Amino acid sequence: MKLRTDDYSASQDSMLLGMRSMSKWILDAMAIDRICMRNRVAMDIWNEYSPLPYQTNFNSRSGTIGRFVEMYINNQYKGIYCLSDRINRKLLNLKKYDETNKLVRGVLYKSGTEDIANQKERNFTADWKAGTISWHNAWELKEPEDFECEEAWQPLIDLYDNKKSYSDIKKYFFIDNLVDYQLHIMALSIGDNWGNKNHFLSIRNIQKNIDDADSTEAARRKAIISPWDLDTSLGGKYNGSAYDGNGYSDWKPADVVKNGGCYPFSICQGQKEYKNKLKARWAQLRTTTYSKESVNAKLEKYRDLFLNSGAWQRMVDHYKTESSKPCLVEDLTKEIGYIEEWYAKRFDLMDAYFGIDTGIATTTTDNQSLNNDIYSIQGLKLNEAPAKGLYIQGGKLRMK
């Protein structure tokens, strides 16, 4: 959505619903998300725990914020939409293009696009707004805006062509940012965001020297990954087929690691330091942002907003009479309950993958080692480990 002046001659920045002033906004129809909040909840989670590693005018936020609205177009009701800001130069504090010297400084790339037809080999559109870096690895150039050029693509090309070791990744990326992004994928099972699509890559100023003796200056040349389009999170599917207790994503945390993901994550998998960072970060976040209580609270906040305002019922009633309709559920409370059950199991799978000590202990009166005692997740002692599923042994949650 673009805001214009009254005579439509120019763009018009404006604050909407308490969000930062912009001329271009996102109106998300959430057409494949049956609860109309997955992207918003997942982005709220990201913003809560993963700030940019530098200061900005927006509290170092790298994800969008949004407000839910009921949409009317030419007096025709369209249901619930999410109005949100964009990931852009101002949000990420990227250095603006130098028009005087015609110099590219800050760059922002968006992964995944249909704007370029040939995605089998490296090529670019004539206006330099989109390009394919490698086989089925297409990007859009979002910054510099209005000054797209070949020079702006060189940093991305250089990363893919020449920075292929783990030491390179540590030098050219913020490892903690990569760890946070991978945990987001693992914890919320966001399979649609682990390949060559649905994320941003930004560099504050490509004119800076990555080898500068001043680490603050060198950091301005490092790349940041920001998430985008998270509507397959929390058990969701790309076609809206997961609902009513059935069909939710069963992509296990271990599968995320085995898959490897796209560059630069594919290079990090298997690195001891990186694995240790993932485990330590999960151990920290499982009691805060990713706790069952915290995730449930975010789901229930938007559930209550939709129900108490009457917006959900209005949307359900409206689309009952329409031939073309988005994916919806009539009973939102019931569906949120199913998703909370899904996340409770996902949380336990994350604990099992990382070998997190649950704090469950037993007292024995014989000489049998505690490590040989096996319990169900309900606390019942078992004679042997189950053939499949979760169980507790030696105070640790395990999985077969």
Where are these regions (language model features)?
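Accessory structured domains or lobes within enzymes
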Residues: 55-77, 197, 209, 213-218
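Middle-to-C-terminal accessory/interaction subdomains
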Residues: 138, 142-195, 199-227, 231-358
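Residue-level detector of functionally pivotal "anchor" positions at catalytic/ligand-binding pockets or at interdomain
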Residues: 352-381
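Phosphate/pyrophosphate-binding loops and the adjoining catalytic core of nucleotide-dependent enzymes
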Residues: 38, 42, 48
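C-terminal tail/sorting-segment detector
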Residues: 390-400
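Internal "kinase-insert"/substrate-recognition segments embedded within catalytic cores
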Residues: 2-32, 48, 53, 62, ...
